[in-house]
Amino acid sequence: MEQQDPIKKEGRLTPVLALATLIAAFGSSFQYGYNVAAVNSPAELMKAFYNETHYSRFSEYISEFSLTLLWSISVSMFPFGGFVGSLMVGPLVNRLGRKGTLLFNNIFSIVPAILMGTSKTARSYEMIILSRLLVGICAGLSSNVVPMYLGELSPKNLRGALGVVPQLFITVGILVAQIVGLRSLLATEEGWPILLGLTAIPAALQLLLLPFFPESPRYLLIQKKDAAAAKNALKRLRGWDDVDAEMEEIQLEDEAEKAAGIISVLTMFRMRSLRWQVISIIILMGGQQLSGVNAIYYYADQIYLSAGVKDQDVQYVTVGTGAVNVLMTICAVFVVEYLGRRALLLLGFSVCFIACCVLTVALALQDRVSWMPYISIVCVISYVIGHALGPSPIPALLITEVFLQSSRSAAYMVGGTVHWLSNFAVGLVFPFIQVGLGAYSFIIFAVICLLTTIYIFLIVPETKGKTFVEINHIFTKMNKVSDVHPAKDELKDIPLSAVEL
């Protein structure tokens, strides 16, 4: 009975854990958000630069078709790079560790920042295209590795809140890019190279500061077999010396899957014991992007203009929308441990479903009913709120929670690949859908939101307050297997009370 006190001890947000979270999220996740939005404001200025560069080389201006193609390639290089970065996650985190991968990833930020910052002086739009590929790789790695790193650093009672922090910094990065990208600031003929090059600042800070913080204790113990280093990391993160209970929980996870080793993506797809976990992350990551979030932002400017917002003022309304996104993600940080992951997903996708349905009606009637454009604005804001509460931050957090150490890196590769391919698909296909369906384009996204909501309600369990082993114990029942991995009986024999933290 005396040994149960440390087992029930809850983790706290120590200075080391808080700073490691902030440095990892600012140095990596912030860059992702910043580079998503950085090219939006100066787009016309950059196209003019492409045209002038072509003229200086060939004494003729580029054709409209070729200019559109070049710009489309420049924009699409980012999600393509994200896809490439997602494929690199598994090999890098298993070889370099979680922290080591984040440090290595700064190469894909600092180098392109220098290239983009000097591209105008060098008169080379090829440098911008290459840089967009490189910052995309950076985003593909950071969008997967930061949630994994923070999820493995956190005690279970803070895992949800800290797991939402990467998405919070993505939204902050978007907002900062929107602010510094105002026409009165850096969205100018001389300022846009600086705007693009600023992404080097968070990378440099992370490169300087993150080495002083611990590697993932789970990586150190389970994959590196370094119990002493894992224990020291836990002591620093928890702020106390008595970490035996948590060490025991990690060792139980190691024992429960010792025969599996490091699982590859192909092996993971073949394993019956991981069937519903894999299906769930594919549906959640696909639903996150295919629910229409990028389409909403794409359409937002037209909606604001139709409501009477002046063209020169749309940029300020866009900043306001970005601020709402940040505020609601902050709310998610504080309520995720109270309401749980499942509730936020259900709430978020339901709000997005309703917003898409009402927006469809509002867009269809806006030429006949004078006040409908204002309903459209309400729908856009409501959609942003709903997505920020659940669909944006929770899926990446769940990948950390529903997979054990041996399969987690492969799971992030799959989830990241689905995320970036879905992102790319929406960007490629939505303009054609908009031309073909017009106001009814958002019905497609409403259906996807509804189907994702139904799946979550029927299949996805609540993971709040549970250890990784306990969560996988839930899935063994769903997968109709007796243990975590085939041919092993450890999990069913592990008393759940023994792995409480």
From Swiss-Prot:
InterPro entries (UniProt xref): Fru_transpt_5, GLUT, MFS_dom, MFS_sugar_transport-like, MFS_trans_sf, Sugar/inositol_transpt, Sugar_transporter_CS
Binding positions (D-fructose): Y32, Q167, Q288, I296, Y297, Y298, H387, H419, W420
CDD domains registered for this protein in UniProt: MFS_GLUT_Class2
Catalyzed reactions per annotation: D-fructose(out) = D-fructose(in)
Transmembrane stretches, start-end: 19-39, 69-91, 99-119, 127-149, 162-182, 193-213, 278-298, 314-334, 343-363, 372-394, 413-433, 440-460
GO terms (BP aspect): cellular response to fructose stimulus; D-glucose import; dehydroascorbic acid transport; fructose import across plasma membrane; fructose transmembrane transport; regulation of systemic arterial blood pressure mediated by a chemical signal; response to fructose
SUPFAM superfamilies xref list: MFS general substrate transporter
Keywords: Acetylation, Cell membrane, Glycoprotein, Membrane, Sugar transport, Transmembrane, Transmembrane helix, Transport
Sites bearing N-acetylmethionine, chain numbering: M1
GO cellular component terms attached to this protein's record: apical plasma membrane; plasma membrane; sarcolemma
Cellular compartment(s): Apical cell membrane; Cell membrane; Cell membrane, Sarcolemma
Sequence ranges on the Cytoplasmic membrane side: 1-18, 92-98, 150-161, 214-277, 335-342, 395-412, 461-501
Origin superkingdom: Eukaryota
Homology family: Belongs to the major facilitator superfamily. Sugar transporter (TC 2.A.1.1) family. Glucose transporter subfamily.
Protein name: Solute carrier family 2, facilitated glucose transporter member 5
Higher taxonomy: Eukaryota, Metazoa, Chordata, Craniata, Vertebrata
Gene coding for it: SLC2A5
